[in-house]
Amino acid sequence: MKYTKLAAVALASVMMLSACGQSANSDNQIVMTVGDTQITESEFNYYMNTYKENYNMGQAKKSSLEYCQRNQLIVEVAKAMDIKLDSDTQSKLKDYQKSIKDSYDREGGYKKFLKDNNLTDEYIDTLASVSYYTDALKKQTETPTFTEDELREYFKEHYRRVKYVLISTIDSQTGDEVSDDKKEEAKKTAEEVLEKAQNGEDFDTLISDYSPNTANDSDENGYIFTDNETGIEFEEGVDSIKANEFTLVQSDSGYYVIKRLPLDESQECFEEEYENEAETINTTMQNNAFYEQVQKWADEYGIKVTVNDEV
């Protein structure tokens, strides 16, 4: 699979956050308003550019909107609740802010970075504070615990298991898209593979013949993924079919012929795959519960979110 998760490192986190919350100017349309804060098109595009390195365009926009709104809500709620950072946290925050600026100085200049991205020094300081306000807000609510049954149910509802053939439309040497003629050839090949699969030909053999060296080629359990982990087209394609059915999906990287596989306790691989994901699922469910609480606080304080769908 050509899609990867964003690295959970401090500098990458700041880059992802850096499209949220800057004051509007007359040159940019407003993409989103969260409370009193307007998010401009240039800010959103900077955020999008970070996600496009890891996701296709559709998923990048979806994730950008979600995380931009989520992070700005945290800031607005913290302000509304008059959350203050203690002296130790403020000291850590200043060190973190300095490390961010130093890292950009090593990469060509912090001031140039601000100018190129239409950002301000004060804004970068605000970005760095988001994780600290998150920690402060978490102290205002209890961290939920989940039963084994709840974790297993989440796994069954939010994870999918598939095998697929990828007919790529990306030149393996240059990384660029192939010509339109070659794209048409790829489409015809994918349609042939789909027809063969639907006519009962062994799908593992089709994978080996048409799509070796992919994420599911050497794994008999197939490829297992969860919400927002692949491109929107791939996820929606899988969700449109039942177990042991096939579909054809076009994406930025080519044409996927997908077979959806069962994922429940009747499958031999279920326990192994569940155990691999259990810790991640628990963390995800705790985070989801926290963000639901943030939204409740936002509602209580009258903090509204408006998205401009025309931009």
Residue locations for each model-derived region?
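Peptidyl-prolyl cis-trans isomerase
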Residues: T189-I232, P262, E268-E272
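PPIase-associated folding chaperone regions across multiple families
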Residues: S23-D27, N49-K61, K112-E184, S208, ...
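Positively charged n-region of N-terminal signal peptides that target proteins for export
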Residues: M1-L6, A10
